[in-house]
Amino acid sequence: MWFNVSEYQNQVTKEIEHKLSNVNKLYLEVVGNCIDQSDFSRIIPGFPADMWKRIFANFKYDLEVFFCVRAEDILDEDKEWEWWREFKDFLTIYLKKIENQYGTKPHIVINGIDVENMYDLVFWFETYFQKQGYRVWEKYKNRAYETSMSRLLSEDWFGNDDHIPTSKKLILVCGLTPESGKLTTAAAQIYQDKEIWIESNYAKLDPIPDYNEDKNSARNIAAQALDLCALHQYGLDDIIENRNVLEKSEEKLKFLRKFYEFLRVKAPDKIEDFTVWKIEFDSENYVNVLKVLQEEIERTDSPIIQKKFIELKDKI
């Protein structure tokens, strides 16, 4: 079955508008590449590579972008200087593409900063992009999913992060990788907004959310495959070996429930209730998932990623 572009675009637009009508600000986590959605196109026939551009054209006058970067990527001692130069140049081009596509200069949010660990490199990174005209913000290291909520939602934790001032209602929270800290960025903002009487909320834009009860469904396997592709693309094979996307999803749901309960706001019962309009899967999607897995197995020279993709393929 060919993907109905106009229906999906209309439904997502309506749901975002509905969520915006109930709050002062909506922090919308955007899954995957915020510039090019061709990875989704590989699994969903007819899904446009510029789907997000089409949708957010409807919100261009009331939209800001947070672009999240892992502090660990800046501080990785195993990276050579040549890699750093390429990373800096790549980010410069990528941020410019975001600005051109969404009509706004993104905020850069550095997540997981440890001020006792090579902070001079983080400061160098900040200074470089500030000189390019970007606003750069700091979010500090915490173990968000293991920390008690009363401690996390305090002046010593989320309250100690930079509170990013925004003038628009819709804030897209993007990042290069699944580990860039998008959820905790949104949560810290919501906590700090509440402290100054701004009502804000969280939602997630993900065409293939990983929350089915059947752990071996095509949807869940597709979500895991795309997650592995993104991590491998940016050289994060060290994360891949012990990666379990479904456990991560469950961790996030537990965190969100506790987070909303602590703020005395009713939390949705299921992770899909945070997600903006999921796409239904059919038999054709199984075929496409198998095809993508086989392509990645043949393409990669990483034993870790090959093993992971073979494990996923064997589940179908």
Protein language model annotation of sequence segments:
Residues M1-C174, E179, Q189-I316:
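Flexible phosphate-sensing "switch/lid" loops adjacent to ATP/NTP-binding sites
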Residues T184-T185:
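Hydrophobic positions on the alpha1 helix immediately C-terminal to the Walker A/P-loop
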